[in-house]
C-alpha cells in the first residue's frame, strides 16, 4: 500500500471514530466510570489484603477475617 493510501485510510478511520464518539457520549462516559470504579476497588483490595489484624479496629475501613484484613466487594 502506498503512503498516500495509508494516510487516507488512517484519516477515514479517525473521522469514523470521531463521529461515533459524538453520537454515543453516554456510552463513552459510562465505560469510563466503570473503569474508574474497577481501579479503585483493586487498590482497596490490595491495600486491605496486605495487613494483619487481631481486632476489627485494626482494619478500618476493611474487616478482620481470620487475622487478615479483607474488603468484601
Curated annotation (Swiss-Prot):
This is Conotoxin Lt9a. Residues 24-40 form a propeptide. Residues 1-23 form the signal peptide. Probable neurotoxin that inhibits ion channels. The keyword Iron does not apply. It comes from Conus litteratus. It is found in: Secreted. Expressed by the venom duct. One of its GO terms (molecular function) is ion channel regulator activity.
Amino acid at each position: 500500500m502506498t503512503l498516500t493510501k495509508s494516510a487516507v485510510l488512517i484519516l477515514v478511520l479517525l473521522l469514523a471514530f470521531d463521529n461515533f464518539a459524538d453520537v454515543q457520549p453516554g456510552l463513552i462516559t459510562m465505560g469510563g466510570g466503570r473503569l474508574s470504579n474497577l481501579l479503585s476497588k483493586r487498590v482497596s483490595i490490595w491495600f486491605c489484603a496486605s495487613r494483619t489484624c487481631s481486632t476489627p479496629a485494626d482494619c478500618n475501613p476493611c474487616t478482620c477475617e481470620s487475622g487478615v484484613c479483607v474488603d468484601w466487594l
